[in-house]
């Protein structure tokens, strides 16, 4: 473990961090004598009211004493959430998205993490194949819950093959052990036709249902293949998607009868592949896997339903743009076209919907989250775009700043010669059209 601690990147005025004497550039080494390896340790050991912070400032090591109010926020930000580095993935899944990336994309995309701390902090999925006994002791002490686990299959030999061939622990025993520690799990199964579909998928769901005291949800996600993946892998077809939904519906009915939750949650993409409508809001049980593409479309439709009623009641809704272009990936294109037509009717402005194909990963990749800046420039560069173009928020990183191929929003605005905004919902679109400060980026932005 690194002894360098966490680099302080920001200190909020009037916060505990400022009161304790922390400064930007300090390194927090320990709290009450406990070395800190990450922000998880900071939260855990920093939960006491009386704290002694061991800090490196330049060449000096200082002890800072301060009292922290009950539930008072630290008010100090760290340069990175993990102070001792990210634990990388040692598996070799044939469908691994990162392994199939071409060169020239945003550097952070090539990090193949498999770190349970990031799973706890940000909901990233982990395989649990690299847990050591020291990790289990920490999990027992700190109760890091929930964790997000890539199961793929519960049958040990099949899971071993799906993860690349090396021996792996029995995921059923690992989940059972997590449950005994009071840690809950949100699981995902990436469906790879010919491997873990059919009877294998049925067995996986059955095994996870038997562990339902620990497993809170199971997302079913179709394998995402690009032109850079091995040819032996097959995509989920509409027919298979329908079969998966039929099986999932049966389990969802059983789970609701016995546990008052649906337990199994097919992703939006599976519904779209099968040509079926996504189910109602209540069936998502609070949207536990929305970041995994489960329920985004339902949220979109619900938001527009509410917003449409509001706009129709307020026919004088103020918008500053008379013409707008809405951009989408292929999968969401029918819904964005519907939105464009209804917005135009209600607001009395020109609204154009443009579907952007994926040139980098191939036309079979239909989600907006994998569109690149280059895709946008090639699809939009020769078109009349109106006063503002609204892009899918999922095209950009967590900070909303960069595309997969490292284009920024100001760079795209300058290249396309028009004002740009991003939106994750119909409400965001109306906000961008309102002309509010900061809602969009002009073409002459720095």
Please provide the spans of the model-predicted regions.
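Flexible glycine/acidic-rich beta-alpha junction loops that bind and position SAM and/or redox cofactors
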Residues: 159, 194-195, 215-240, 258-282, ...
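Short, structured beta-strand/loop micro-motifs enriched in basic residues and often containing a Trp
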Residues: 4-13, 33-36
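Short, Lys/Arg- and Gly-enriched loop/turn segments at beta-strand edges
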Residues: 34-42, 62-63
């Amino acid at each position: 473990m690194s002894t360098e601690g966490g680099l302080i990147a920001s200190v909020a005025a009037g916060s505990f961090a400022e009161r304790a004497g922390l400064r930007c550039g300090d390194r927090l080494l320990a709290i009450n004598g406990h070395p800190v390896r990450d922000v998880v340790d900071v939260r855990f050991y920093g939960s006491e009211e009386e704290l002694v912070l061991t800090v490196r400032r330049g060449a000096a090591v200082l002890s800072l004493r301060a009292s922290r109010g009950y539930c008072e926020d630290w008010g100090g930000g760290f340069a990175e959430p993990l102070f001792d580095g990210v634990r990388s993935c040692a598996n070799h899944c044939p469908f691994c998205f990162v392994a199939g990336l071409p060169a020239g994309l945003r550097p952070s995309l090539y990090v193949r993490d498999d770190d349970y701390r990031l799973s706890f902090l940000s909901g990233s999925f982990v395989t649990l194949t690299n847990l050591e006994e020291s990790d289990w002791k920490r999990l027992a002490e700190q109760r890091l819950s929930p964790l997000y686990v890539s199961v793929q299959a519960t049958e040990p030999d099949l899971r071993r093959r799906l993860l690349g061939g090396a021996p792996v622990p029995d995921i059923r025993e690992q989940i059972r052990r997590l449950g005994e520690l009071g840690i809950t799990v949100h699981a995902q199964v990436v469906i790879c036709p010919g491997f873990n579909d059919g009877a294998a998928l049925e067995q996986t769901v059955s095994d996870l249902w038997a562990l339902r005291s620990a497993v809170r949800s199971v997302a079913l996600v179709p394998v995402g293949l690009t032109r850079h993946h091995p040819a032996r892998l097959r995509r989920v077809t509409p027919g298979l998607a329908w079969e998966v939904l039929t099986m999932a519906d049966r389990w969802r009915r059983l789970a609701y009868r016995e546990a008052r939750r649906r337990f199994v949650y097919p992703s939006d993409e599976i519904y779209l592949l099968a040509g079926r409508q996504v189910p109602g809001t209540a069936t998502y049980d609070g949207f536990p896997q929305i970041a995994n593409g489960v329920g985004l479309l339902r949220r979109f439709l619900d938001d527009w339903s509410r917003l449409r009623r509001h706009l129709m009641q307020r026919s004088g809704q103020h918008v500053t743009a008379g013409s707008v272009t809405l951009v989408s990936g292929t999968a969401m294109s029918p819904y964005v076209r519907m939105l464009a037509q209804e917005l135009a009717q209600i607001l009395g402005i020109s609204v154009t919907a443009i579907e952007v194909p994926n040139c980098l990963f191939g036309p079979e990749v239909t989600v907006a989250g994998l569109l690149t800046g280059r895709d946008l420039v090639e699809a939009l560069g020769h078109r009349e775009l109106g006063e503002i173009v609204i892009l899918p928020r999922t095209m950009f990183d967590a900070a909303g700043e960069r595309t997969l191929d490292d284009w920024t929003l100001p760079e795209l605005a300058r290249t396309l010669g028009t004002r740009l905004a991003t939106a994750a919902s119909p409400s965001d679109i109306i906000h961008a059209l309102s002309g509010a400060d900061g809602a969009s980026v002009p073409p002459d932005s720095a």
